[in-house]
Amino acid sequence: MSAHLNEVRNKSKRKWTIPLTWFGGKAWLASKIHQYTPSHTTYVELFAGAAHILFAKEPSPLEVLNDLDSDLMNFYQVLRDPRQFAEFERQVNLTPYSREQFEECRDNWHTYHDPVKRVWAWFVIHRQARNGMPEFNWIYDTTQIRRGMAASTSRWLGSIEGLPEAFERLRKVQIENRDFREVIKMYDREHTWFYADPPYVLETRKSGKYRWEMNNGDHLDLIDMMLDIKGMCLVSGYDSDIYEPLESMGWEREIVSVHSGSTKESRQEILWFSPNLSRALQDKRKGLELISGKT
């Protein structure tokens, strides 16, 4: 095990590093959602993507990352396996920030059968492409400098330097690669907190696509299940009439202004809170107020 990894484990206050950028990712919203963490035993991200919320929160006794993208989940599997992670880390440390290397990985990654080599090539593509989207070209800089080097090179090296923290955070996380309907049924308990950040409703976005999209029927199935679960749930997405049934059944909502992707265009993201989540957060606030009043 690397000395760097041992240093990570000895930190009293850990800053978890997010290893990926992802279309529809919630890096900009993670700290806000972290404020809405209820008392819970099990945490489930139904549509993991880059898992920004998991990396923003403190570990729970039982945690689950789920996504239908099998290559994404294979990446997380390699990151949490000590033997595979050691080899993966060795390979990425030997990988230059190179257009030729990027194009070779982009053209051949799907032909690699060795799981670590496949994940290595997949990671190179996602970290060296613009906005982390492999259908885009290799990103390079002509003027932007960061840490005494091209900003794009700095970001690549930073993503490698953060891998030990990602390994440490994922060690005890369960990885699922299932339809969200199955995962809800499997993990729904009174003390489960579900975070659902599904692919945006198609009519609410101008561009971009996920590898695994959801049609309106899928969104309606998600809503039906959320209205019938025992656990608590926070749903995020762009405003859509499809999600109106949540509000009609007592779910609270909060509007958050955000910037869309790499543009400066302002969009409004909606957070929907299940009634039992709202109650749990109220109880948490009251408890903190009581503690504060005694000090």
Task: Show which residues each predicted segment covers.
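Class I S-adenosyl-L-methionine
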Residues: M1-V64, L68, Q77, P164-F167, R181-W193, Y200-T295
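Serine/threonine-rich low-complexity intrinsically disordered regions
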Residues: D81, D141, S274-S278
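SAM-dependent nucleic-acid methyltransferase catalytic core
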Residues: S2-L29, Y36, P82-Y195, P199-S207, ...
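SAM cofactor-binding core of SAM-dependent methyltransferases
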Residues: Q35-W109
